[in-house]
Amino acid sequence: MWNIDSSDKYDAWFLTLDEECKEAVLERVLLLREYGPNLSRPYSDILHGSKKLKNLKELRNQTQKHILRVAYYFDSARNAFLLTGRDKKGKDQDRFYKDLIAESEVIVERHEKELENERRNKNDGK
């Protein structure tokens, strides 16, 4: 089993979803917890286009009304980290992914700084 954590941005997005969408997303999150970085299409895919991140991925699922995507990566602590989620239905694909990746890069940068601070504080406490 892989550890999974999430950003405040992801958590806020998830709370806006209807029950059908929440179930669809949780289905993929449970697969991610089980398979970790080995989870592949059609459940997960690599996100290309980031100049900063080589290991950015997306969880993929859809309902009758929504095409759901959750950006995630494996952080420096080797945990799956859910970054943000969006509904792709009716969106321009290039713009959708450009915005998703840009937002993900900002969240990753902040998250990695927090992890580094935690490591420093832990080492200072020894």
Predicted regions and their residues:
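Basic, Lys/Arg-enriched alpha-helical interface segments
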Residues: 1-67, 76-80, 87-126
